[in-house]
């Protein structure tokens, strides 16, 4: 179980969700570190997997192995936050696979959090579980705004700057324990202020998949950027 003084490893989902999750743990006094997002961690993961697992599960395991080794963390006081929910795929098996892969890498004793995303209070302290859920929703909404506006921006880079500013707004709100609704109101104003030309809508393309794929530019091989380059507008279901 998660204990005071543990180092918490945060899976890389995307730039926003992972940063918000890490900051949520930090506000509760934990040392939280986001796993690397690169092809290298995929190679590491596959060295300690059976080969038939979902790519996101392999990426998470590889990221945990690389971070523990590179930062010389003690597995017994390291907690891998790995939320799951019972659904018709291998999602609930991610924690099992991560435990097996890290043990194969010689990192026995790593705490792999089997956290039900819909009932996190059994594992996580206080309101932390609710904050993690809330920030996941906020991050998803920010990306919806971002992908809705970026293809139509009049000034190149305006949506990217707004995305960076939005990240800062939510991180500060977490540190100050401010309500997320108020923070998101300021984020919405940022994107509302971007000048755009959307009189003629582009073809809309939905990107489906679990959250470790549809947002992750390494695992999905930058599919969202490619769609926009080809003249489409991204729709990311939450």
Language-model features: locations:
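An N-terminal assembly and electron-transfer interface module characteristic of large anaerobic redox
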Residues: 1-238
């Amino acid at each position: 179980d998660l204990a005071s003084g543990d180092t918490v490893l945060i899976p890389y989902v995307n730039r926003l969700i992972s940063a918000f999750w890490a900051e949520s743990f930090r506000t509760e006094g934990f040392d939280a570190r986001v796993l690397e997002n690169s092809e290298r961690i995929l190679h590491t993961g596959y060295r300690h997997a059976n080969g038939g697992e979902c790519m996101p599960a392999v990426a998470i395991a590889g990221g945990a192995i690389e971070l523990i080794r590179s930062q010389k963390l003690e597995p017994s006081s390291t907690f891998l936050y790995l939320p799951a929910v019972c659904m018709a795929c291998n999602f609930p098996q991610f924690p099992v696979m991560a435990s097996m892969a890290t043990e194969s890498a010689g990192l026995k004793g790593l705490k792999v959090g089997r956290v039900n995303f819909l009932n996190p209070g059994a594992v996580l302290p206080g309101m932390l579980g609710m904050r993690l859920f809330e920030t996941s929703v906020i991050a998803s909404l920010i990306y919806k705004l971002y992908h809705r506006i970026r293809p139509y921006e009049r000034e190149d880079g305006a949506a990217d700057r707004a995305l960076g500013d939005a990240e800062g707004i939510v991180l500060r709100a977490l540190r100050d324990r401010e309500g997320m609704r108020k923070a998101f109101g300021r984020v919405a104003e940022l994107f509302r202020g971007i000048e755009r030309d959307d009189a003629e809508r582009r073809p809309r393309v939905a990107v489906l998949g679990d959250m470790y794929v549809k947002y992750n530019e390494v695992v999905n091989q930058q599919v969202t950027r490619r769609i926009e380059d080809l003249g489409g507008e991204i729709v990311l279901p939450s």
